[in-house]
Amino acid sequence: MLTKLNILLIPLIIIMFLQCSKNPASTKKEAPIDLTQAEKRLVESDNKFGLKLFKEIVKEEKDKNVFISPVSVSMALGMTYNGAQGKTQEAMQKALELNGLTIQEVNECYKHLIETLTQLDPKVQFQIANSIWYRLGFTPEQEFIRLCSKYFDAQVEGLNFADPNAPHTINAWVDENTNGKIKEIVDDAIDPSIIMFLINAIYFKGIWTYQFDPKLTEDGWFYLPDDSIKICKLMAQRNLYRCFSNADFRAVDLPYGDGEFSMTIFLPESEKNVDSLIAKFDSDSFSYWISGFTMSNDSFDIYIPKFKLEYGLTLNEVLKALGMAMAFDPFQADFTKMYQGGGVWISEVKHKTFVEVNEEGTEAAAVTSVSMTYGVNHSDFRVNRPFVFVIRENKSQTILFIGKIVEPTL
């Protein structure tokens, strides 16, 4: 049966976060994550950077689906940050919102977060992997390698980049660490000027705490930004939910597994434009909204589209706009802590993601590669128009994925 709501058509946003806050939907006793003040500041820094990154991308990808993983980008650039020196390090520190944190604090915080977040919920698969691949004949600074290995658990390998099998070796690592969802990040032929790849990979698979019944999934109307209508599969469920609403949007929280992770969907009010909602997303607002979620008094229906998306882009221009231009300048970049001889700069930051949402749960993956070159309304909640959703871990407020969907695809 086709269903329709008389509402304004607005673009769809998808935002997936890793968020830490108490989730009443979970029935198990929660063991809190003990975060130091530095770790709390790092989480806040990653969220600030992730939201700035998302907004900048959305400017360029208007009325398009967007899906990124801020934490993946942050970790790949976090390893790179260990090789920066002088004004280049200062520029990266500012762009990544790391002011007030020493590099030692940054490294120790990432180490603890990697160890903690991957072990929180036995019913949710959440994996983080890092690697560094350098050209044989190029000798990276050993202290740089030691730091990335110790704090980011990075696998470090020297390869003959001229060997036709070298890209396959790197891409096989990517494929393995995203459970086959992202097949490659390195081109078939590696540019002779590239001397290193710093790569982060993330894989997430969460089963809904309360799964959707496939028998209730039906065709429904989804309203696109150009006023057209797309027929998509709408999943349906009636339950009690943690909710929040204000003049701009309504939001519902859907837990995974034991409740350590969840997806939060932000649906703009019908008369609001989704881009105006994006403009209001910042770290402080997000934390305020999440703290305001409460359990609904009554059960109500929600309708969510099934969708699958593969997304990718080069982040060079976006990162330059955020203040990192010097790191991309072969004449100004200073990565002498990575290679003492100098002359090394970032030639490309490539980002790829995957997400699939269905009745069972959500599967998502992300890969970021840094190429270093030498020289609450409780009525029915029907998600049939552009909306925002957040996947979060419910305790640490680290943003994991953030995206924008203007058209559900399978």
Q: What residues fall within each predicted segment?
A:
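Non-catalytic, conformational "gating/processing" segments within enzyme and secreted inhibitor domains
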Residues: 103-269, 290-376
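C-terminal soluble interaction/assembly domains
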Residues: 348-410
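C-terminal, non-catalytic macromolecule-binding modules
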Residues: 283-286, 319
